[in-house]
């Protein structure tokens, strides 16, 4: 059951959206279609009611959504879900929220979560900016993870990169004081842009010092994107910022 709060604190229980309705509702980006297998389609049909959160545009009480009070971790753009699934398996004391627009990746993770018997993961198939702006209360998150966002490697496309000043300010708003922001990239110039943006964002302090990086933490499993980058000779930058 979804748990929403209206402006006057009244609980609102909307009807679930179908997969086609979720696709039509997204307006701020073009969904990557990819190859949507029958198994992934069945995952939406069978497991979305258990793990899925339909975008409504109203603030949510996350403790009610998960049925408990626990630290909340958000992963933006979880891809095929490998990192999020790994974290949920190995850090069960956390509640996890994942956001992804790539339907096959969502379907794959739904199948994995059902196989694992996970109870503390909720997924959005929607635009992260919209979810953060309209459904996540300020200061509600203990950690935000963004692993290997699209580098938009051509210079003329850099403006499309996710990590921009306005988005960084939004992330700061949603993190509680004492929380952290963890990002990883295998593109050197994107790491430079992340440092440029985040070091200039009030409320964030690089745990490794100015333009510093940390070793890959235990909670981040190596993804196929990371392995692909390493095969191309790319190194990986893990950046960890504390919310102050």
UniProtKB/Swiss-Prot annotation:
Keyword Transferase part of the UniProt annotation: yes
Family the UniProt entry places it in: Belongs to the class I-like SAM-binding methyltransferase superfamily. TrmB family.
GO molecular function, one term: tRNA (guanine(46)-N7)-methyltransferase activity
Residues annotated to bind substrate: 154, 186, 223-226
Catalytic activity: guanosine(46) in tRNA + S-adenosyl-L-methionine = N(7)-methylguanosine(46) in tRNA + S-adenosyl-L-homocysteine
InterPro entries, per the entry: SAM-dependent_MTases_sf, tRNA_(Gua-N-7)_MeTrfase_Trmb, tRNA_methyltr_TrmB_bact
UniProt keyword annotations, A-Z: Methyltransferase, S-adenosyl-L-methionine, Transferase, tRNA processing
EC number: 2.1.1.33
Function comment: Catalyzes the formation of N(7)-methylguanine at position 46 (m7G46) in tRNA.
Cellular component terms per the entry's GO annotation: tRNA methyltransferase complex
Main EC class the enzyme belongs to: transferase
Pathway membership: tRNA modification; N(7)-methylguanine-tRNA biosynthesis
Entry keyword Cell wall biogenesis/degradation: no
Name this polypeptide is given: tRNA (guanine-N(7)-)-methyltransferase
Active site: 150
Residue sites binding S-adenosyl-L-methionine per the record: 75, 100, 127, 150
Lineage: Bacteria, Pseudomonadati, Pseudomonadota, Gammaproteobacteria, Lysobacterales
Highest taxon listed in the record's lineage: Bacteria
């Amino acid at each position: 059951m979804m748990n929403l709060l209206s402006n006057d604190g009244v609980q609102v229980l909307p009807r679930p959206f179908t997969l086609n309705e979720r696709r039509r509702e997204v307006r701020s980006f073009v969904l990557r279609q990819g190859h949507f297998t029958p198994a992934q389609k069945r995952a939406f049909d069978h497991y979305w009611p258990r793990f899925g959160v339909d975008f409504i545009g109203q603030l949510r009480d996350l403790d009610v959504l998960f049925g408990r009070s626990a630290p909340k971790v958000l992963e933006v753009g979880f891809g095929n879900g490998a990192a999020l699934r790994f974290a949920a398996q190995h850090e069960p004391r956390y509640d996890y929220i994942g956001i992804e627009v790539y339907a096959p990746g969502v379907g794959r993770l739904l199948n994995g979560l059902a196989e694992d018997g996970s109870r503390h993961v909720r997924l959005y198939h929607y635009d992260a900016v919209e979810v953060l702006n309209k459904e996540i209360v300020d200061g509600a998150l203990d950690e935000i993870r963004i692993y290997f966002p699209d580098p938009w490697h051509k210079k003329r496309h850099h403006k499309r990169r996710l990590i921009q000043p306005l988005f960084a300010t939004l992330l700061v708003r949603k993190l509680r004081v004492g929380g952290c922001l963890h990002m990883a990239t295998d593109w050197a110039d994107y790491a430079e842009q992340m440092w440029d943006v985040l070091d200039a964002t009030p409320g964030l302090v690089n745990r490794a010092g100015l333009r510093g990086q940390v070793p890959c933490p235990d909670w981040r499993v190596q993804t196929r994107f990371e392995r692909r980058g390493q095969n191309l000779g790319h190194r990986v930058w893990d950046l960890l910022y504390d919310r102050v």
